[in-house]
């Protein structure tokens, strides 16, 4: 059997951006060779197949990630600043970080996706989301980032699939070791990531997106800082989203970037009344909402898009207005997982007030002294 013709056909499909036909042709060959000769396709064909699969995987991840919302209002100034940041990366061919800061439900993720959806022509995108539960697992965000980087490495023929897997296996099985081992691996990992980012960004500019970076473990921040310290003359955009709180080691990292003029910062503010009203009206369609109801919803939501969306759903279902819906409560519970039981109870009570509640009243509701409430707050 001459595999050359199959290889040429697969190459043609690859060049014409038809991944489905590449995969179909590959498996036809696999089945034929296995049935007739009991062998597998040659290494060149296998590598081409893995390249196409890696690109397809990467494209599907990005498409899923960048799904646009149908309800997007305001943030014109923030969007312009984000677009200016990405333009700067392309024009100067220099790495730079951007920090998008805001409270729960303020729209950090929505704004980021809205802008990145218009940048895919110029940038490749790799992302990771950080979780509080994984802060004790060393370098977990880098596992996610390397998963995406691996697809690009294979797609661009920088390394073969087997070579990439061998390198990954040399880092992550050892993460449960002693602190000294972790420190050594952090240094090695930073050098490896630096090399990979340089090679990938030579092909096309790159975005490294880290969501909820306030949950990044200290070792992951150390790797990120080492990479940014040594990355020069490559178009790599480091975009990080963060809650209002910041662990000290992450704060120190941002301060050092600021001193080197390598960090842009955008803090998202709640929507104003006019924009909030337009947002609600867009989500509820032709449903009539009185000025009084709009004012009440705005007072409780404080212009936070996530809350506005929940209250719009209530209106559409014709339900009685409830400031603390089950979805809002679940989101707050996940985002504020570090709260004690008393702090959670205080949040529940505060959510029921449309205006500030007195400390004395809260103390009475909680069955605590005024001093204890002040300490909790």
Predicted regions and their residues:
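Canonical tetratricopeptide repeat
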Residues: 6, 40-41
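Conserved small-residue packing positions in alpha-helical repeats and bundles
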Residues: 10-12, 50
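Amphipathic alpha-helical segments of tetratricopeptide repeats
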Residues: 30-31
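Long amphipathic alpha-helical scaffold segments
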Residues: 47, 52-57
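Key residue(s) within conserved catalytic/signature motifs
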Residues: 3-7, 16-19, 23-27, 57-377
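Short coil/turn linkers that connect adjacent helices within long alpha-helical scaffolds
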Residues: 35-39
């Amino acid at each position: 059997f001459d595999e050359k013709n199959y290889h040429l056909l697969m190459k043609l499909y690859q060049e014409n951006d038809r991944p489905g036909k590449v995969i179909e042709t590959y498996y036809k060959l696999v089945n034929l060779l296995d049935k007739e000769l009991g062998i597998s396709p040659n290494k060149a064909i296998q590598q081409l197949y893995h390249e196409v699969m890696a690109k397809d995987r990467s494209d599907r991840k990005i498409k899923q990630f960048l799904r646009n919302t149908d309800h997007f209002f305001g943030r014109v100034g923030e969007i312009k600043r984000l677009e200016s940041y990405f333009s700067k990366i392309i024009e100067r061919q220099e790495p730079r970080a951007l920090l998008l800061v805001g409270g729960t439900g303020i729209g950090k993720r929505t704004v980021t996706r809205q802008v990145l959806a218009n940048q895919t022509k110029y940038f490749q995108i790799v992302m990771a989301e950080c979780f509080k539960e994984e802060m004790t697992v060393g370098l977990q965000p880098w596992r996610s980032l390397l998963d995406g980087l691996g697809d690009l490495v294979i797609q661009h023929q920088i390394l073969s699939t087997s070579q990439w897997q061998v390198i990954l296996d040399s880092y992550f099985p050892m993460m449960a070791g002693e602190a000294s081992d972790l420190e050594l691996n952090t240094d090695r990992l930073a050098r490896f990531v630096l090399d990979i980012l340089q090679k990938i960004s030579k092909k096309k500019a790159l975005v490294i997106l880290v969501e909820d970076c306030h949950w990044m473990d200290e070792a992951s921040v150390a790797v990120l800082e080492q990479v940014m310290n040594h990355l020069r003359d490559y178009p790599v955009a480091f975009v990080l989203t963060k809650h209002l709180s910041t662990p000290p080691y992450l704060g120190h990292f941002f301060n050092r970037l600021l001193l080197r003029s390598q960090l842009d910062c955008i803090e998202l503010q709640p929507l104003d009344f006019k924009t909030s009203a337009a947002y609600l009206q867009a989500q509820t369609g032709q449903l009539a909402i009185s000025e009084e109801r709009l004012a009440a919803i705005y007072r409780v939501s404080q212009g936070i898009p996530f809350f506005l969306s929940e209250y719009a759903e209530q209106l559409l279902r014709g339900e009685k207005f409830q400031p603390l819906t089950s979805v809002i409560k679940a989101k707050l519970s996940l985002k504020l997982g570090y709260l004690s039981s008393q702090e959670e109870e205080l949040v529940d009570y505060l959510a029921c007030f449309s205006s500030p509640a007195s400390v004395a009243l809260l103390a009475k509701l909680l069955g605590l002294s005024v001093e204890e409430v002040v300490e909790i707050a």
